[in-house]
């Protein structure tokens, strides 16, 4: 499959899912203000789309959000089918994106090292 097409489809799916989370999903487990789609990776054969989401909150909040999104897979696939020009809509796989939390942790470590060095001088 053409890599440009796969990237374009990934981008379009990301837009549709993001919009659906904000405007259409009614599941109380999904806090629209604290959930964002960070990336979508579609396989070259377009059969699977891994959707990475960032959730602000504790592990229980993340678990509930994943449950809500998995429950809404059928609806989200329908939205993708209506808005993205595809013969077959890929299976959706939702995963928590931990990169933002990891980067914040690293940033905090760097700040604490900087403060320790500053206090020693």
From Swiss-Prot:
A single cellular component GO annotation: cytosol
InterPro entries: KH_dom-like_a/b, RbfA, RbfA_dom_sf, Ribosome-bd_factorA_CS
GO MF term (any one): ribosomal small subunit binding
Location relative to the cell: Cytoplasm
Broad class of the protein's primary localization: cytoplasm
Sequence similarity: Belongs to the RbfA family.
The protein's role, per its UniProt record: One of several proteins that assist in the late maturation steps of the functional core of the 30S ribosomal subunit. Associates with free 30S ribosomal subunits (but not with 30S subunits that are part of 70S ribosomes or polysomes). Required for efficient processing of 16S rRNA. May interact with the 5'-terminal helix region of 16S rRNA.
Quaternary structure annotation from Swiss-Prot or TrEMBL: Monomer. Binds 30S ribosomal subunits, but not 50S ribosomal subunits or 70S ribosomes.
Official protein name in the record: Ribosome-binding factor A
Source species of the chain: Finegoldia magna (strain ATCC 29328 / DSM 20472 / WAL 2508)
